[in-house]
Swiss-Prot record:
PROSITE patterns: HMG_BOX_2. This is Mating-type protein a-1. Pfam families: HMG_box. Binds in vitro to DNA containing a specific core sequence 5'-CTTTG-3'. It comes from the Eukaryota. One of its GO terms (molecular function) is DNA-binding transcription activator activity, RNA polymerase II-specific. Disulfide bonds: none annotated. GO terms for biological process: cell differentiation. PANTHER family: SEX-DETERMINING REGION Y PROTEIN, SOX TRANSCRIPTION FACTOR. Residues 116-184 bind DNA. The keyword DNA-binding applies.
Length: 382
């Protein structure tokens, strides 16, 4: 048999070898790196390896080389020369690279520059100096409460102390601009900022009984921390494998949580330590209701409707959409809404009174009936 037919030409072997690995150069492979089994690479003739390098240059337009992958010892990498570190041992005319523990890295022009932190302003420096002191004096305070205290201190601080921190802030900013002349502050766009959901809304998504009282609910760790902060002492957080279980504390906590989901403009709730009485059990909510005892017609604009039992596990009724979580117009707008609701109730009652049939007219007793009544049962004013 002819030798040429028994042993194919090297260029044909190169084409066959390249066709088996070239399908890895898809649009998803932006690094242009091909993975080759180490056993196949070791069984490949050096001339075929050189041919594969040439085919790689034709396909990508860049000089290629082989490199050992330290993360997977059974894999050989084929990629651009600039992708691999130049201080490694290179043999066989730049065809093979064995870093012995050093793996490929992205080119310097593709590496993302480290983000330069924004220089702190005067208040941030002031807060940094006083935060630890406030925490040591009040170990139970939340960071938000500490920020309020430090903010009041900064507002009432002496002018020379404030000027000191303003000078410190200007020095830090000047030093940063000298070290990074190209620095520009680029704030995040509004659509890129993750919106924080109100803890009252998260409480609404939990499970309630037919009377609107919180039973239990499962949320993630982040939501559990938010609920624990705003409803401290009212709920109990139990950590589980699939999340955190929110359980309402007995009696007072359940009433206050029901008030929270109905009146979302009300402030943060804490545990009510007063003993429970029969009057408290009879009340629907544990706060002063300006419309207590009034008759409510079925009106979607009112906070509450009566004689409607929600299904099991249904959330409480939605509050007035004009109130939102914190009413933008303050307490005056809330009082105005309450007055409007009272007026609506009065108008509804007056309209119902007009539709009732008139009472029968008063008729005088006939003389015959008068004669039938004994005189002893009649009484006349003197």
């Amino acid at each position: 048999m002819d030798g040429n037919s028994t042993h194919p030409a090297p260029n044909l072997k190169t084409t066959m070898a390249w066709s088996r690995i070239s399908n890895q150069l898809g649009h998803w492979n932006d690094r242009k790196v091909i993975a080759i089994p180490l056993s196949d690479f070791l069984n490949t003739h050096p001339d075929i390896q050189s041919g594969i390098i040439a085919e790689f240059k034709k396909a990508t337009g860049e000089e290629g080389m082989f490199a050992r992958d330290p993360e997977s010892l059974g894999i050989m990498l084929l990629g651009p020369v600039k992708l691999f570190k130049p201080d490694s041992v290179v043999v066989d005319g730049n065809l093979f690279w064995d870093p012995k523990g050093i793996h490929a890295s992205a080119p310097k022009e593709q590496q993302k520059k480290a983000k330069i932190p924004r220089p702190p302003n005067a208040y941030i420096l002031y807060r940094k100096d006083h935060h630890r002191e406030i925490r040591e004096q009040n170990p139970g305070l939340h960071n938000n409460e500490i920020s309020v205290i430090v903010g009041n201190m900064w507002r009432d601080e002496q002018p020379h102390i404030r000027e000191k921190y303003f000078n410190m802030s200007n020095e830090i900013k000047t030093r940063l601009l000298l070290e990074n002349p190209d620095y520009r502050y680029n704030p995040r766009r509004s659509q890129d900022i993750r919106r924080r959901v109100s803890p009252y809304l998260k409480i609404k998504l939990l499970n309630y009984d037919v009377n609107g009282n919180l039973l239990w609910g499962t949320v993630n760790a982040e939501d559990a921390a938010l609920i624990r902060t705003h409803f401290h002492g009212v709920v109990r957080v139990e950590e589980m494998d699939d999340g955190c279980r929110i359980v309402c504390r007995p009696v007072a906590g359940s009433r206050k949580l029901r008030a929270a989901v109905v009146d979302t403009w009300m402030p943060r709730y804490t545990v009510d330590t007063t003993p429970v009485t029969e009057d408290d059990d009879a009340q629907a909510f544990n706060f002063n209701d300006p419309l207590g005892g009034a008759y409510f017609p079925l009106n979607e604009h009112l906070w509450i409707t009566v004689n409607q039992n929600p299904p099991f596990n249904a959330p409480p009724p939605n509050p007035n959409p004009h109130l939102d979580f914190v009413h933008p117009d303050g307490m005056e707008a809330v009082v105005h809404n309450v007055q409007n609701m009272i007026a609506q109730v009065q108008e509804a009652n007056e309209a119902a009174a007009l539709t009732l049939p008139p009472p029968p007219p008063l008729r005088l007793l006939s003389l015959r009936l008068w004669l039938m009544i004994p005189l002893t049962q009649l009484s006349f004013p003197l």
